[in-house]
Regions:
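Glycine-rich flexible loops
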Residues: 1-294
Length: 294
């Protein structure tokens, strides 16, 4: 339990940590250290700290307390201190010396008590499509009781917070961030959990059918080369359909695309060995891509 949480709020805060852990444990919502959640009480907001994982909520100290009002004022005044939000940490309650997430400022401008931001794979997939406005409107029409809006892509940090601040006063229940992810907000943990379930169902996308990969053959191909066969079966689908390959190699679509895979995904040429591919890259002074499609 975080220090500074009133006894009467302990159950709600524990529920918040449990929700954070659930979101962090779902690969279709959170990948690695991505995403963040927040809980506001008495002018203080507990938000996921930089570099921590939602999946560790409740097991490790990952929430850092910040003062909401001065942070919001700084953001609206275009004060550079709003970017990292470290000046607004409640030091007396920050026993682990954690630093706020770079996205702390947008959590602060949203008035709801509980806010969950995560990198929903399906929300991202729909938000990068041509005609995304109509596609999303048709999907969200299934949830007429939820107020929702879209937010254009902006760099995480104050640029994104400025855009969210434009719509925050309308108290949106759901914000779909183009090329980034989703935000779900509410007054209670259970309200947010229910909304997440509803939005997840509404935005669900069927996977494109592909043939099966051959891990044994891939293992033979990479012998002597600086690559390993992906352990996740789903990852192989990227290479098993022409449309998937076109999307994967067509450029970066969202921040985590670059964080996890870099700016380039390699494709093995017809008749080319993996070893020859690696040697050619090395001879040209090029870094090895983090993913090679065969």
């Amino acid at each position: 339990m975080a220090s500074g949480i009133r006894a009467e709020d302990e159950a709600a805060f524990e529920a918040f940590l449990a929700l954070s852990r659930e979101i962090g444990g779902d690969i279709l919502k959170t990948q690695g250290a991505g995403g963040n959640t927040s809980f506001k009480r008495d002018g203080v907001m507990w938000v996921k700290a930089s570099g921590t994982w939602l999946a560790h909520a409740g097991e490790q100290d990952i929430m850092v307390p910040v003062e909401v009002a001065p942070l919001v004022a700084a953001l609206r005044a275009r004060d550079p201190s709003a970017e990292k939000a470290t000046d607004f940490v409640v030091t007396a309650l920050n026993a682990s010396g954690l630093r706020p997430s770079i996205e702390t400022s947008f959590h602060a401008v949203l008035p709801q008590t509980v806010v969950a931001h995560y990198h929903c794979v399906n929300a991202i997939a729909l938000s990068v499509l041509a005609g995304r406005e109509q596609i999303l409107a048709e999907r969200m029409a299934a949830l007429p009781d939820l107020a929702w809006a879209t937010v254009p892509y902006r760099r995480p940090g104050t640029p994104l917070a400025y855009e969210i601040d434009r719509v925050a006063a309308n108290r949106p229940d759901v914000l779909i961030l183009y090329n980034h992810g989703i935000i779900v907000a509410g007054e209670t943990v259970e309200e947010v959990r229910t909304r997440i379930a509803c939005v997840t169902a509404a935005l669900s996308v069927d996977e494109r059918a592909t043939v099966s990969g051959n891990a044994a053959h891939l293992q033979t191909l990479i012998e002597g080369a600086p690559f390993h066969v992906a352990e996740d079966a789903g990852s192989h689908k990227t290479a098993l359909h022409p449309a998937n390959i076109a999307v994967a190699t067509g450029g970066s679509l969202y921040p985590d695309h670059v964080i996890f895979l870099g700016t380039e995904i390699g494709v093995l040429g017809a008749g080319e060995s993996v070893t020859a591919y690696a040697q050619t890259r090395g001879a040209r002074g090029l870094d090895m891509p983090k993913m090679l499609l065969v």
